[in-house]
Amino acid sequence: MAEPEKKRDQPFSQEKDEEKDLYLVHDEHESPLPLTVTSRVLYMLGDIASGPAYRFTQWLDLVRKRSATYGSSGFPHRLHRIDDMVTSAGERNTDPKSPPSRQSSEISLWERLGKASTVDIDSSCFSWNMLSSLHHTEHSSSTDHSEEDQSKPLEVTVNSGGVVFFALFNSSSSEDASRKEEAAVIKFASSRMATQSERLGYEFSKWLGVQIPQARVIHSCNPEWTLIKEATEKAQAKATSEGDEVGEMTCSELLEALELSRCLLLMSYVHGCPMLESMSSFETEEKAERAAAALGRILVLDLVIRNEDRLPCRQLRWRGNPANLLLTDRIVSSAKHHECSFDEAFDSAIKRYHPKDYRSIQRERRASSVDSRSRLSISDQMLVSQASDFSDITESPRSYDTGLMSPMSDRSVAADFHLVAIDSGVPRRPPAGKRASDQEIYPRLVELLLNSSQYSSNLLHEITEGSLGYPQAEDGEETSNVRSVVTPVVREFRNGFRAGLRDLQEFHIFLVTLHQKLDVLLRAFFSMMDKTMCADFDREDFAVPESPSHTHGHEVNHYPSPSKDRVPSDNSSDHSESDMQKSVPRTPNSENKEDGSSPKSRESWHGRSGKGGESLSSQRLAAKLRDFHKFAKVDAESNKELDQWNETLRNEVMKLCQENGFNTGFFEGSDNNSCTDAYELKVRLEHILERISLISKAANTEKPSMIQENLFIGGGLAARSIYTLQHLGITHVLCLCANEIGQSDTQYPDLFEYQNFSITDDEDSNIESIFQEALDFIKHGEETGGKILVHCFEGRSRSATVVLAYLMLQKKLTLLEAWSKLRKVHRRAQPNDGFARILINLDKKCHGKVSMEWRQRKPTMKVCPVCGKNAGLSSSSLKLHLQKSHRKLSSGSVDSAMNMEIQKALEALKLSTGRGSSASSNSFQSHPG
């Protein structure tokens, strides 16, 4: 402790000299020892700002030491709950342990930030000349915090890490005299890629309807970078003249960060506090429902980008960070009626799918209200849980409401209630162990969240740390009071999750297209590199294997080298499957078909996996990409080739993104980095598509309908939803469509006991022949204490027929009673005409009379009463036939002939109703006698 005390006594000038020496001592050829594998790859790509990553790390250590000496730039101790916030400093509780000067400084800044309005960083009126002061949080280099340290503000170092500065500007607007200042946030990450990845994460947030602050990346090559330096120097001079030593130090640190970094992230300031720290987040049921709906969308976002630093979830092994989900009572975007992130995502979707309607929608809609009905894609029914259980629909009446509003629209979130997600960086490549874990956890979580209210409630309880939802009772009992309060909240949570899945499906195809575009261009680029550097590198080591996007059935364009002198050859080699993939067991939702966006088919593009998820081939490509950049500096022809490829990659990818209204955050800096940006973006997209594939497959699920406590009915989707079956306790599966494609591949004899029958859904099929054997299987399941699922392909005809036969033969119900019981919980049940006749005969055999009358579904052929020929299926066809073939008949005779035909049809069907009788929605009708 003595040495740090001495350092604190050293003058600032000496510390600054030490810092300069630290940077000058660095040798370009030294290996950056502190770097991880990922950082080494980024270093080889030339990504680390102004040198190796440890420069930024060591500078950050110096900043932390200064924070220990000079305090937190006046930033208040740990964000207080909204309930504890007051408008005046006199009403606020003070910490007696804090020095008076520091305490007053913190209160002063807290008041300034609270009263400041939010800068519209995208406005043309935004100017750095209005910058008045800079502040930043305290920094902590230790992960173990004492109780005293936990009361201090935490540095925002989640995902991308780095340093966060709070910038206060003099207000340029005189609309509100009480707000003389405006606030914004400046964030420096440890690398250019980390900054761009965070901007990419915000883009995903916007497209998924998650509320976010405004954010944009500013690169050092941008003229705005110089304006920031000049404004900071002016603010530093102002702080010096006022004797503000801390303010001067903060400005100095920002200038140092500008020298070290190649880009920064500028964001709008969010007035609020962590959601879980606010007692008002869930004080009313209405607010709780709105928060739950927003959390459903945020969960989809974090599953896609694999962000484990926001929502705590033991099942997903996410540690969570409540500070990255803020509750605010102010609109996040600018006060000048700037559209919120949900509106921007909606606009992008409309521009893509209905460009002609975009202008009219813009004119007609309100600035703060968006009807999400227009945002639903045609694939809603595929992604929304296809639950046929009527009890589930009763519990969740709005689960199928196509008018579901976005959690960020004015109908679902009041003007004084917003949940804002911050720090949504997209990781480069998750470790192999986490990827393997995701492949096991994702399918189960998504499937059960869609199909089980109880599971959804438990999950909501976990991610809100007990604020919403309810834990699973140890004795399995739940009070009616708890259920009545929680059910609407859980319903909104599931609705928000479903809405996020729909939005995800909307731009999934675009992401696949973008990945394929990058894949084709980079393959050609790497082939050119291989040809250019073949004298220096092992061709076999550098050969680019066949990309999965080429073998996935998509026709892609081949891009020749931009240079006319060099035509890259297609050097492809077969790579063995990833070791990580070989070690991953087959999950129940996995299929034999390989998806072009699946990790299994893509892994060979990069070769075998190394430690930490870094593939060895990827490391070689990264190293050779770095070396090729060095080689191009001394070889004029290679330099020209590289410039042409940078331009081609940038133009092709940017064009595709602009056409679809998508901002990746990449390709906005120097043109010399386009090849590197393309490669890094592709790596991130691969793993995003991998997770989207897991989510989409799991979302294609169905909850079986419960006929009685131990008997369920469903379709093929229900039979494949094994996590749902296990959750329901199903042990036996009666399959009536074993001969159909894919059924044998989706059975799991290690988990369930199967009885397979091959019955076609035809009227002539003798389904009666399997009744006894099927009933014996069901009876066997009941006797062993199990639960049985009866399913066919669609869960409509064959399975419904067998269940009705079981209820009549085993439970002694009449056909009418069995039909009512089945239709009450499984509304799509509809035996075909042939099966219906069999059931009617069975009803008469068991009870001596028919309790229901059959009404056939298929229309009968209209036969001409004059000549006896088939005229068609409709009455209009018969009338046309009479007019053409029997012209001598008068119009009255035609009507008479029509009446004759109708009378014959009525007699054949034994119906007492007249010509104008309406059709029943049921296949069966109660017997009139």
Curated annotation (Swiss-Prot):
Q: Where is this motif: Nuclear export signal?
A: 903-911
Recorded hits in CDD domains, A to Z, give:
AFK, DSP
Question: Which stretches does UniProt call biased (Basic and acidic residues)?
Answer: 552-580, 591-606
Subcellular location, in the record's words?
Answer: Cytoplasm
Q: EC annotation?
A: 3.1.3.16, 3.1.3.48
Catalytic center residues: 792
Cite the InterPro entries for this sequence.
Actin-fragmin_kin_cat_dom (IPR015275), Dual-sp_phosphatase_cat-dom (IPR000340), Kinase-like_dom_sf (IPR011009), PHS1 (IPR035010), PI3/4_kinase_cat_sf (IPR036940), Prot-tyrosine_phosphatase-like (IPR029021), Tyr_Pase_AS (IPR016130), Tyr_Pase_dom (IPR000387)
* Subunit-level organization: Interacts with MPK18.
Q: What is the recorded name of this protein?
A: Dual specificity protein phosphatase PHS1
| Species of origin | Arabidopsis thaliana (Mouse-ear cress)
Source lineage: Eukaryota, Viridiplantae, Streptophyta, Embryophyta, Tracheophyta
Gene that encodes the chain: PHS1
